[in-house]
């Protein structure tokens, strides 16, 4: 059984088995991008097109800040490739998780699954930009962030669990 709710500029998904046991949940918040200015646009112009879900109780709270793990840091330099980009010609937010899982490495991901993660997007990553990434791990916890020059573009924090 699935649950889905759209609350303005965000979505919530929950998946349950036939006995009602929760298998997983996910939430997202998003913004409108003015493609001419490459800045966030106020949502007022489309709010009238969105369903009124003000009576729904949010099944997930708002995401908090990502906690940077205090473990040893591993850095890499990345330049986005074509398949990292979406229709808006910037790196798609799902690609940041790909980058993170790749940085954690094949051996780690063969032995572990994501128990939870939070991804915060600060500013878009564009083609040609060199991104410095930092991976920190401490036990089953990790943090991964990307910077263009001195500007943080995104950060991810999470916890791994052993695969069964």
Where are these regions (language model features)?
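Single conserved hydrophobic/aromatic residue that forms the stacking wall/gate
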Residues: 2-13
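Residue-level detector of beta-strand face positions
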Residues: 14, 31, 143-145
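Acidic, low-complexity central loop/insert segments
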Residues: 15-28
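Solvent-exposed strand-loop boundary residues in beta-sheet-rich modules
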Residues: 18-19, 36, 150-152
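A structural microfeature
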Residues: 24-26, 42, 152-156, 162
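Hot-dog-fold acyl-thioester-processing enzymes
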Residues: 25-27, 34-115
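Short beta-strand edge segments in extracellular beta-sheet folds
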Residues: 29-33, 161-163
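Acidic/His-leaning functional-site neighborhoods
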Residues: 76-160
């Amino acid at each position: 059984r699935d649950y889905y709710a759209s609350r303005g500029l965000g979505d919530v998904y929950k998946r349950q088995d036939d006995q009602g046991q929760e298998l997983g949940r996910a939430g997202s918040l998003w913004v409108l991008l003015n493609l001419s200015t490459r800045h966030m646009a106020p949502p007022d112009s489309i709010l009238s097109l969105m369903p009124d879900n003000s009576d729904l109780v949010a099944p997930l709270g708002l995401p908090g800040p990502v906690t940077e793990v205090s473990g040893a840091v591993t850095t890499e330099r990345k330049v986005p490739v074509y398949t990292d980009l979406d229709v808006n010609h910037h790196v798609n937010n799902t690609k940041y998780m790909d980058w993170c899982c790749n940085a954690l490495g094949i051996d780690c991901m063969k032995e572990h699954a994501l128990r939870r993660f939070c991804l915060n997007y600060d500013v878009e990553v564009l083609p040609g930009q060199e991104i410095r990434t930092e991976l920190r791990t401490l036990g089953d916890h990790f943090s991964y962030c990307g910077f263009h020059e001195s500007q943080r573009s995104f950060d991810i924090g999470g916890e791994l669990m052993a695969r069964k």
